[in-house]
Amino acid sequence: MEITADGYKTIHEPGTEMKICTFLWTYYGYPTACYEGQNVEMVRYRNGAIMARDDAQRYPEMDVDYVCGMPASGIPPAMGYAHETHTDLARPFIKYTPTWLRSFTPPNQEMRNQVARMKQIHVPGLIKDKKLLLVDDSIVRGTQLRETVDFLKQSGVKEVHMRSACPPIMHSCKYLNFSRSNGEMELLPRRIIQELEGNRGQQHLDEYANPDTERGQALLNWIKETMGFDSIGYQSLEGALEAIGIARCKLCTYCFDGKE
């Protein structure tokens, strides 16, 4: 349904079963809002704790000075991660609010890059000689990743580990305008897959989304080596669903797994 100043119109006839966008809790839901009884802020906090629990198995030797949330919706999962791992929480980046609210919403890449540069102000004392684990709500096009790492390296950071609070986004949303891309190849994982295997790789999206597969590891290694991270990890779809706490059949996961 589209609501305007003059009324509303039906874009798509309603289905027979409820399907709520999983990204609602991860990214664009307001922190104080509750959907189906699940508060956005608390879901994001649980999401970070679940990532930390899984990381303890995947990276048992990892040791960082600070867990850092990328403003603004990366902060709650960072808090959950820090609490679960008994690690200090820090804010090396402060959001500069008089810019575009979301860096992935401008229509062209040049403008997205400019917004990404403008929207963060750094705190040098929380970066130099520190080992940081950054948590962001999602990685859609990767607009900020390379510039963030380059900046941190230039500022003397010792290590940079990156975590995404949602699974790899493999499909452009076909239902909501807020996340529609000009094409699937604007999505970072799809571009990487095309570079690694060409069109053949696009037939194995499920494998690339799974870090326990050879293709999944290839995707992570590409991001790690190309972007300059010391490690990179995504929340699993199962972990995200666990954090939300609603039956999977009531949630839309199309952008992650392509299932309608």
Predicted regions mapped to residue ranges:
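PRPP-associated nucleotide enzymes
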Residues: 2-260
